[in-house]
């Protein structure tokens, strides 16, 4: 693992090579948590859940704080962030706002993933694995180089798991599932100054999840997972990225074209109780297209220049029906309606009742979005000093057409069943746009010993729409119409504004030993955030959640990383501290200024030792023991800071053997079976927690031909 790479003088980053990923059995971006200082992606929910927190800031739903690029192509929907990492050459995690080069939704950084190249590696790779929870993992790939200028590869993988958490109401595990993927890559060098690189991939997910257990705040006890409707997540994705580069004497022109299709379906028992409250679905089909043109000139005397244009278009068609059942009808609708009915009609001789024991609030949305950006970054070198300045001008527009509707039949008298039909409809459209100026400035001083730097960068997170609020809006409209007191409702609360931040850094990347065996990285940072986007639950027995803009918040802290090679030993260690609080946030019912930001850990720790055990070559070419420990905490679960997860640490280990074309590994995670929570939320007045995976282990067999 490298603690910095690339233009290390300008930002803080961590890179993991293929050998790091495979020897440590890292198969998902979620396992980067704490390996990268102040980076945390909790494992809960399903593969749809990609909540990432960096330096105290993050997002549970909608827009991410971290962008993701695979072979240079941006991933436009964070529902696709959690996928199987197979045949990955390296991963780079950049921390801090990356607005100039990457634009929207990179206020916390960017994750750059690079797959294996058929021009650099040729052969066949096969992996067979079996582990805890009856988990099976199969991987197969072929890399070929038909000439010095053309290479191609094909790779597939399949995973299965029975799951780790049992739903005691349904009598079976709730988080098992299957996923598979296919990747095709072609690289062509038609001439010395032209390259063409195309990657086509498809993925499929069919799984459960949402192992949420009810928490009793009075007894502080966590009940077993028990809800009566099955939860599931299905996802089909197609992605294609085409990168064409033209090389000139002093410059490079790059064109990157990306297309992505996401078709996913989520089904939830949204009350997560063994009661017939309500369930919901979310079905979406999203197409996205991106195009970027970049000119990079590095040999202009003391100057260097990078500039380009970027554009994107997304079209999302979504349905989010909410299925109310008998207990939910009685307690969430009729109870409130009858209380209001008695208030408006004195005497108490009337009572509302529904003929249906269940009904559906249908919510359909069409959400197109497009954006365009111009960016430039220039630098100059003055001896040991380097100065860089950049600016990105970005505009984006998004609209939402909504159609919410429900039909029920009701009566109003206790004794006489006078049937009435109520058709409630809420239709309309909203739009939001933003024009952002994203500057950056950095100064670095370096030599053979490393460098020190100072930087200031601005980033922004796009605004959007609270689609999950529409069932609540229609429910309130329905209650008003039932009691003869219709209310004027609008969709203004469904729009949230962009989030902006400035990241200021002082840092150093040092290699004090002449042999390069010691790398040290240190960073001090301060983040000033305006209009922070927070996921909140409306007051009362709400069925939805919403994104809200807080007034202002900040985070300051430190990041440290060390890598040391000593003979057959490799030591890696990292530490992150983020002191993140609200400066201004009046929620209406409480002034939360000074409270810690929720869901992000205050500290992260990591330590890993790899020991290449000396053995006769007749036994093994490689025999490596890896022992790692990651620590996270404290994490506050709400804005009031009344609930929190104390600090916890997870121990992992692996033993890797390779001889010729063959290899095997034994691995284990959470070896001490630590009990900890990864997520908390409230639903219709109830508290729930998701727990971390228990001790799990497995064995892998590898063949490389």
Provide a role label for each language-model segment.
Residues 71-97:
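Short acidic/polar hinge/loop motifs at secondary-structure boundaries
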Residues 313, 460, 630-638, 656-705:
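C-terminal beta-signal and adjacent terminal beta-strands/loops
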Residues 29, 51-56, 69, 90, ...:
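N-terminal periplasmic accessory domains that precede
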Residues 296, 302-306, 310-312, 381-384, ...:
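Gram-negative outer-membrane beta-barrel transporters
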Residues 13, 30-73:
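Extracytoplasmic beta-strand/coil segments of soluble accessory domains associated
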Residues 123-125, 130-161, 169-207, 235-240, ...:
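Transmembrane beta-barrel wall of Gram-negative outer-membrane proteins
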Residues 1-22, 50-51:
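N-terminal periplasmic "start-of-domain" segments of outer-membrane beta-barrel proteins
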Residues 243-268, 451-455, 478-549, 554-556, ...:
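Membrane-embedded beta-barrel scaffold of Gram-negative outer-membrane proteins
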